[in-house]
Amino acid sequence: MARQFMAADYTTILDVKIRLGDVLPANHLARFVVSIIGQLDLQSIYAGYGEQGGAPYAPELLLGLLVYGYATGVFSTRKLERSTYESIPFIYIAGGKHPDHDTINTFRSQHLEELKELFVQVLLIAQATGVLKLGSISIDDEVVEWFRTRHSE
């Protein structure tokens, strides 16, 4: 008699409703990033947006993706975009939205100077709250220089 196997049913319909806030543990890095980004002063970034065109993605969302991406080794904007579909922490940070790689890259390029300062602020807060482990990253001019050289045109 042949062995019976349970096969995958790829036509199964899942009717599941999940609140993004319920899928990550309370102490997850993605929650920390969202919390810290919400405390930063982003007025200089908001000031650069006009009234014309469609509604842009919130700077907090795009900055959160960049910060979390850098913290977890995801630097490519194409990988960041893909992660908003495939990775629960990125989906959480993006609030279920999916900015394309060009939008993320344009945001990064247009706000490079502000982002350098904001990244340092995030790192300092992470260090002060104990989220940043000793030896993970140095917080000095090298971080800013690395960020500048990696993303200057």
Regions found by a protein language model. Give the residues of each.
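Detector for conserved single-position "signature" residues within domains
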Residues: 1-153
